Swiss-Prot record:
It holds the Pfam family Glyco_transf_8. It comes from Ajuga reptans. Belongs to the glycosyltransferase 8 family. Galactosyltransferase subfamily. The keyword Transferase applies. This is Galactinol synthase 2. The gene is GOLS2.
Length: 292
C-alpha cells in the first residue's frame, strides 16, 4: 500500500502489477484492491532440499520471485521489494537497452555477509580500492547485485531455464539473490545506487551516497522498516535514517494519495496493479506490443 501511494505521488505513467502467494489472506487482498491494486496469485517456488542455513530464515520463500519471468504479456518489468519506496519518478528505466538485466550493486560490509571471503578480508565492490582483492584467492568475484530492485524482460525460455537450473543448484545463504547473480552474470549491467539505496551504504560508504539525488530507498537494514521502526537497533538513531523513515510514513499517512482520493486515475496514468508476495515483492510493467 505504501509503495502504491508512493508511485501515485511521483506520477508514474505506467501501471504496477503484483502477485500474491496462495496463503495471503482475503482481507489483505481486499485492502490491496481498495488501493487500486490488481492481485495476481502465483504458486511458491522452493529450492532443492538441503541443510543450507539462509542469512535470514524467510529468504527461502524468496525463490517465488522467479515466477515473474513467466509474465510474458509484458515486454519489460521493474521489480521492487515491498520494503522499498520510490521518491522520484523512475519511468525512464523502461527505456534501457533490451537484452540486459539491470540492478544496483550490493554492499558486502554488513554482518549478514560474514560467511563470504569478501567480508572476511574487508573487500567491497562499492570501494574496491580500499582493500584490494588478494591474488591468492584467485580471480576477483564478478559484480554482484542486490535483487530488491531490478529491470528485466519476461521470457518463457528464461523462466523454464531458471526453474531447471534451480533444481540442480545447491541453495546458498542469500537464496534467490545468489542464484540470480549466478544465472544472470553474463547479462547483468549495473545502474547507479540512486535506484536502490541499500541503507548500509549510509554508514559503510557515505562517500558514494548523494541523498538529495536518491530516487529509490530500500529499507532492508535491521530495524529500518518504517512500519515497525523504533530507532533502537544499531545505526537506526542516525538523523538520515530518521529522515528517510519519516518520508515513508508521510506518504503512507497521506490520505490524498489513497486510490479513492484520485478523482480520475486514468487521466493521471495511475491505474495501479500490485502483487504482494510473502517475499513482499511488487512489479511495474510495460505491456507487450499487441499482435496486431
Amino acid at each position: 500500500v505504501g509503495l502504491a501511494k508512493g508511485l501515485r505521488k511521483v506520477g508514474t505513467i505506467y501501471p504496477l502489477v503484483v502477485a500474491v502467494l496462495p496463503d495471503v489472506p482475503p482481507e489483505h487482498r481486499r485492502i490491496l484492491v481498495e488501493q487500486g491494486c490488481v492481485v495476481r496469485e502465483i504458486e511458491p517456488v522452493y529450492p532443492p532440499e538441503n541443510h543450507t542455513e539462509f542469512a535470514m530464515a524467510y529468504y527461502v520463500i524468496n525463490y517465488s520471485k522467479l515466477r515473474i519471468w513467466e509474465f510474458v504479456e509484458y515486454s519489460k518489468m521493474i521489480y521492487l521489494d515491498g520494503d522499498i519506496q520510490v521518491f522520484e519518478n523512475i519511468d525512464h528505466l523502461f527505456d534501457l537497452e533490451n537484452g540486459y538485466f539491470y540492478a544496483v550493486m550490493d554492499c558486502f560490509c554488513e554482518k549478514t555477509w560474514s560467511h563470504t571471503p569478501q567480508y572476511q578480508i574487508g573487500y567491497c565492490q562499492q570501494s574496491p580500492k580500499r582493500v584490494h582483492w588478494p591474488k591468492q584467492l584467485g580471480p576477483k568475484p564478478p559484480l554482484y547485485f542486490n535483487a530488491g530492485m531490478f529491470v528485466y524482460e519476461p521470457s518463457l525460455p528464461t523462466y523454464h531455464d531458471l526453474l531447471h537450473t534451480l533444481k540442480i543448484t545447491p541453495p546458498t545463504p542469500f537464496a534467490e539473490q545468489d542464484f540470480l547473480n549466478m544465472f544472470l552474470r553474463d547479462v547483468y549491467r549495473p545502474i547507479p545506487n540512486v535506484y536502490n539505496l541499500v541503507l548500509a551504504m549510509l554508514w559503510r560508504h557515505p562517500e558514494n551516497v548523494n541523498l538529495e539525488a536518491v530516487k529509490v530507498v530500500h529499507y532492508c537494514a535491521a530495524g529500518s522498516k518504517p512500519w515497525r521502526y523504533t530507532g533502537e537497533e544499531e545505526n537506526m538513531d542516525r538523523n538520515d535514517i530518521k529522515m528517510l523513515v519519516n518520508k515513508w510514513r508521510d506518504i503512507y499517512d497521506d490520505e490524498m494519495l489513497d486510490y479513492n482520493a484520485v478523482a480520475d486515475p486514468a487521466a493521471d496514468g495511475l491505474q495501479l496493479t500490485a502483487v504482494l508476495t510473502e517475499a513482499a515483492g511488487v512489479v511495474r510493467f510495460i505491456p507487450a506490443p499487441s499482435a496486431a
